[in-house]
Amino acid sequence: MDSVPRLNSVFTLVLSGLWHFGLTATNYNCDDPLTSFLSLRAFSSSSDLTGRSSPAQLNWRMGTGGWSPADSNAQQWLQMDLGNRVEITAVATQGRYGSSDWVTSYRLMFSDTGHNWQQYTQEGSIWRFVGNMNANSVVHHKLLNSVRARFVRFVPLEWNPNGKIGMRVEVYGCSYRSDVADFDGWSSLLYRFNQKTMSTLKDVISLKFKSIQRDGVLFHGEGQRGDHITLELQNGRLALYLNLDDSKAQVSSTAPLATLGSLLDDQHWHSVLLERVGKQANFTVDKNTQHFQTKGETDALDIDYELSFGGIPVPSKPGTFLKKNFHGCIENLYYNGVNIIDLAKRRKHQIYSGNVTFSCSEPQTVPITFVNSRSSYLLLTGTPQIDGLSVSFQFRTWNEDGLLLSTELSEGSGTLLLILEGGTLRLLIKKLARHGTEIFTGSGLNDGMWHSVSISARRNRVTLTLDNDAASLPPDTSWLQIYSGNSYYFGGCPDNLTDSQCLNPIKAFQGCMRLIFIDNQPKDLISVQQGSLGSFSDLHIDLCSIKDRCLPNYCEHGGQCAQTWTNFYCNCSDTGYTGATCHDSIYEQSCEVYRHRGKTAEFFYVDSDGSGPLGPLQVFCNITEDKIWMTVQHNNTGLTWVQGSNPEKPYAMTLNYGGSLEQLEALIDGSEHCEQEVTYYCKRSRLLNTPDGVPFTWWIGRSNEKHPYWGGSLPGVQQCGCGLEESCLDIRHFCNCDADTDEWTNDTGYLSFKDHLPVTQIIITDTNRSKSEAAWRIGPLRCYGDRHFWNAVSFSTEASFLHFPTFRVEFSADIFFFFKTTALSGVFLEILGIKDFLRLEMSSPSEVIFAIDVGNGPIDLLVQSPYPLNDNQWHYIRAERNLKETSLQVDNLPQSMREASEEGHFQFQLNSQLFVGGKSSRQKGFFGCIRSLHLNGQNIDLEERAKVTSGVRPGCPGHCSSYGRNCQNGGKCVEKHIGYSCDCTNSPYEGPFCQKEISALFDSDTSVTYMFQEPYSVTKNTNLSSSAIYTDTAPSKEIIMLSFMTAQAPTLLLYLNFSSQNFLAILLSWNGSLQIHYQLSKEESHVFTINTENLANRRVHQVKMSRDGPELSIQMDQQLFSYTFSLESEFQRARSLVLGKVTETLGLDPEVARANTLGFVGCLSSVQYNHITPLKAALRHASISPVTVQRTLTESSCVSMVDSDANAVTTVYSSTDPFGERDEREPLTNAVPSDLAVIGGIIAVVTFISFSVIGIMTHFFYQHKRSHYASQMKEKEYPENVDSSSRNDIDLQNTTRECKQEDFI
């Protein structure tokens, strides 16, 4: 390809850059006064106090001393004609000289023609200028966005309440020159190249346009190999098509790469800038920029022959175009520095033009805006009593509902209503004697586009036409006879009219109308404004103030924007965020926070930056008692085999963690420690080589850097863990695999340098030699500790504070932190701007104030607490401001919220440092602690700044005073350097908050015995001193707690042995009632029976028995019972405690022995005697505790067993099946009549002999089957993909089946 065009394109790009610089440079001196030399005729107004136009230049003192209208109301304005289009950069105002008349606020409007005005906007809203406070001072405003116009209009909004409207004004700027081309919708400009193909690596295309229609092509170019570029108006939005060297892509079939803008058919100027470098491009429309990457295979754009502007002409067919042409004006059209319109005006040979003129023709249409949905209306008159009716107009709106037209017909022919209902047009003709007729047409008409409506009626025929499409007629209109009325109400009805004159079954219309025709005659809306035609209320005439509130989209995190005329709304579904603008994450920032919310181990979504730009990431939170591990899986955690790789053809595997690197980095940076286990199995496959050699294997980390060290080693040291420990197989090497042996070996270790994690890729290059094999495994990313949640500082004096760089925020700001204090008041934080500010403070012990000003005036939100906030307990505060609302939340108290104004300042203007713990003036300082401060999801590291700040200390002790209540069931809160933990040593529960029950499943012969002869505490420290409970002195207090579930009665739950004869037994009797047997001595025995219901009902029941001296209380589930022993009763210390079956039955009480016969079949949980937890000791610390377990004790969950199959709890004794059918109404007894005792004895002897014979036979068959089963187990083969744990599960299930079968026999 010829290189000359490429050089030319680069050269023209440089020229275009100089051209843009030149435009910018001219603005430095664009501040000349523009009204000083205007004639009197240049000024006009809505009305004048003198009845004629008055000069109103700044500092004017003659005559009336400026302009004042005849009446001071919201419909007044002052206008000036500057003669030509100029660039306006500033305005200034004064009051009327020598009077009490001045304007305190106003709006600015501008126009090229004196019609179709446009309001000045700034920060995305219609700007409200601050005016004067007296008649003589000058208030000057520099326009942030300069405007180019010929006509300027000042519209007073507020004025001196003790005077009237009065103004003297000045406009500053400079002359403005431009090249303009007018396209009539049937013509175009062609820019033909000097060579066949123009090939560009970079492009800059800029222009301004104003359009009459919603559709039309602005420019187009294409090449024979598929390159094309097209900029096209589609439904009032600009669509850009751009493709580089892809013959498959066609303009007509592909979707646009970028779409920007909205309502661009408003006949106002809009700017466009396209900048492309290779495949990267920026597309800007009216200061809204979208970055994208082009399609195609190369970096060059190859355009053949020509570029067309205004349309896409068909070759060899003059006057024929592929798409709808542009209808409007284009200004300052530059293509890579070439002024296309200037070439056309000078009739250069490169330009071929159709019917294009070089001055912008302006259609004289006058739009009107219906502002208020309750009171806006327009009344126009027509010719009454004509046989028929004809009305037409155009409208645009965002609202689904509104009255468009209401008119009372003559000759009693009824009332005609045209309504927008749910975005559909509904025509209704109502007569008193009949129900009326209806016509429906269209849908989605609240899309902001202009829609034309025409109603034509003559005799009994009615036609409704929408956008040139006639609606279908109702089936029967023969009864209609329509005669035109005198009054036509558009948009709404006045309050003082009767229903017959104007009907409005729906709210008033909010939107714009234009081109109103009645009886085929156009209506002059300027005459309406001047009061000579019709009447109106709450209208803006000669102005369509429609605004797209969804451009830009202020719904964050992918929220979908919808709007009405006055507001916008965000749909946050499926985004993971909530709030008015989808700003607030619904997920927590770490596993530590989930733990603090009382969650247990499971999968969670973690949003590390909260309301920041990063989305949530799914992790597994393993919430245990010591460390809270957060695990992120990737797509290849299994063992992967590698063969055939060498340095020329390396093996590479990329790991995907289900999230972006930015998400993973935020997660890692917020953790105290992170690690990944890496393993390399090798046989004649080297891993790292020598420390100075080229590594054979390496991995890529977060920064896309190569890391030639392995798990267990340090960053920058090309070694494995065995190299640092000097334990490698070959001392000459620093990795086991580098020994290059013929035997399998491995190098395994943890990578824990956070700045390098996670592992994103592994590369292996030494598996291509003879007998060379390797396999690798990279474990998931695992982290623990939250560096942010417990990040706290203590302010020791009220004069101390921390300062940080300014808080960068545009539209949304949220602040979250915890605090605790004993002070009466204090400022938490403050940040200032020139006028704006943001401050949070505790104004009193029960009040928190969020004070904020973004330019619309200060707002104070107050939350009052019914309890004191200076109680030295942790409280949290969340404050937020967005475009929709401002809110303040303290703890779980009701939120204080205020909606934002529909128009006004949106963007924060904050530039000072962020002050935490006080104000910049060092007043109202905060005394106490602040913790976990987050601004817009970003953590503020308070502790690091406190290390270098006097009067502020890192950390804040005393978490247990606030969070100790989280440690439940006897757990003890323990202070830690970071946060706190719950010590469950003396609790029968476990888990982070001692909430997880410890349960076990008992068979009929299971026995758990705890001996009290040796002191024991459920810790790993066996050297603790003995408790007083182990002395011979009897305890004055005793507490016994347990939960049980069974279907067996009678049964023994717990047996506490004091001596050979004295005991305490908790059991269920034959009828399922609870009995407590208390044998204190040979002479003193007590039996307490609680006969509330049959407790052997497969449900979990709780028993709590508490004795304080002679007072005994027993709580059975929710019922409480009290007993009192005699004062002479003597209590002894316990020697042993048995759960389940008591194996040493000698001397056992007969009733207890009967309950013990069948043992206990069921589930026990949360067993505690004083601070001893025998079941916990048996399941968790059997090796260091004085506990003995006989037969099978299976850890389980009583609650889950209730929810699942209750038959899991069973017994082998079918004659007393605890789950058998039983009439609970029938009393049970163990009394046996004496005359049947002998017969029973004989039967028992015969039965015993029979069962002995059966038992011998059963034993024989069982041994035979057992040997057969063992041989089966030896021959059993497992699939290769079944791991050892799965094999154990299979074997366990098979064994259980065999045991059940034998038990049944």
Curated annotation (Swiss-Prot):
Name under which the protein is recorded: Contactin-associated protein like 5-3
Tagged with keyword Manganese: no
Family per record: Belongs to the neurexin family.
Glycosylation sites: N282, N496, N571, N1023, N1057
UniProt subcellular location: Membrane
Cysteine disulfide partners in this protein: C329-C360, C512-C544, C550-C561, C555-C570, C572-C582, C929-C956, C960-C973, C967-C982, C984-C994, C1163-C1198
Matches recorded under Gene3D superfamilies: 2.60.120.1000, 2.60.120.200, Galactose-binding domain-like, Laminin
Source organism of this protein record: Mus musculus
Residue ranges constituting the Fibrinogen C-terminal domain according to the UniProt record: 584-790
GO biological process annotation, one example: cell adhesion
Lineage, opening ranks: Eukaryota, Metazoa, Chordata, Craniata, Vertebrata
Sequence ranges assigned to domain Laminin G-like in this UniProt record: 180-360, 367-544, 791-956, 1013-1198
Entries under InterPro entries matching the protein: ConA-like_dom_sf, EGF-like_dom, FA58C, Fibrinogen-like_C, Fibrinogen_a/b/g_C_dom, Galactose-bd-like_sf, Laminin_G, Neurexin-related_CASP
